[in-house]
Amino acid sequence: MRVLPDTPNLDFLRQEAKDLLVALRETDPTAALSAAQRAVADQYGFRTWPDLKAEVERRRSMPPTADSGLARDLADAFDLGDVKVPMTPISYAFMGRRWRLETERGVWLVGPVFDWIGDDQASRATELRERARAAGVLAPKPVRAADSALVRRVDGKSWRVDEWMELGPEVLQPVRSSVARQVGRTLATVHEVAMPSDQVFTPFAPGHLTYRHSDAEWDQLIAGTSAAGKPWTDDLVRLREGTLSALESVPFRPAVEPLVVSIADLNIEAVRMAPDDKLALIHWDFAGPHRPEWELAYVLVHWTVYGQANPGTARALVAGYRDRAGAVPPLNLSSFWLTITAHLNWTYDQFCTARSAIGDEKRAYVEGELQQLIADQLTVTKIEQLLEELQPLT
């Protein structure tokens, strides 16, 4: 489920519905705008378009506010100059709320990041982003403090800053084939400029893309969820005993060639459309060692398996990759091992967090994620169907 911005732009939502209508008409020429509007409302968790519009009005009438001291401290930490106006809330995301900060030296996007994202990680992600920007990928420019730091601790959290970039609507499923093609071209461009890495990928080592929880850990999660009286305990049991166990059986195949540092999380929420209908990549924080084959598999799952993807979206994405790279990494079931591991860990983490989430926003966000995980399950069968659809493209 998508989360509405803190001060939603109704014009953006109307544009999202129009874009969605184009995508719907790629498979059903008779699709009406009302169907696209219902689909937009549904993806934001509302039954009807009028319900969504009512929520837009409610949010705009009472946006979140930040302490004036936070704006001042952020501006001081990153040497941005004196604050001109109170910070404007942008949206609540999985790492926390992002804000628009205006100072005498410019306009900035500021947001918290996970504690494990320090300067070394941010520097790696920034180098990749700058290489990609130089190669034509649209992305905001990261900001360094006076001492060149990219991450600063402010008010008990780690923060990063980007120069403000005017962006258009979010991208919703199903995506237009032209957007899918842009995603493929963009991924190929990132792979083209990716830095070499001397890291060796070790299955089950610590890390979101490598570590897998033991049966005992899953049993403890189920027991804790049950003891807390959570209504989704039975859903968790069914997931664990069914699709998740089947996914764990997919074998790992080691990389033959050295790994590269790539974006590592090019999902549908990591992008926005720019005013010229060009794709902009706004999330680079997780950049790390990868293999083009594995990352293409990850992107295909996130853009063409999750959600209500159109038939042909995967082929359009792969065609876009070939447009830029000239060739496509061959894929098989083992190519999805990292994607599966990330899905297993995301599922585990969301059920853990939901058990003790504090605050209405955090609770609403994570419970929305649980609904999605339960309703739209990743399965081995879906991956096999994806591979079959792509033949003979890959």
Q: PLM ranges: what are they?
A:
Residues G224, W346-T394:
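ATP/Mg2+ or Mg2+-diphosphate-binding catalytic cores
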Residues Q173-D235, E257-L259:
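A cross-family kinase active-site recognition segment
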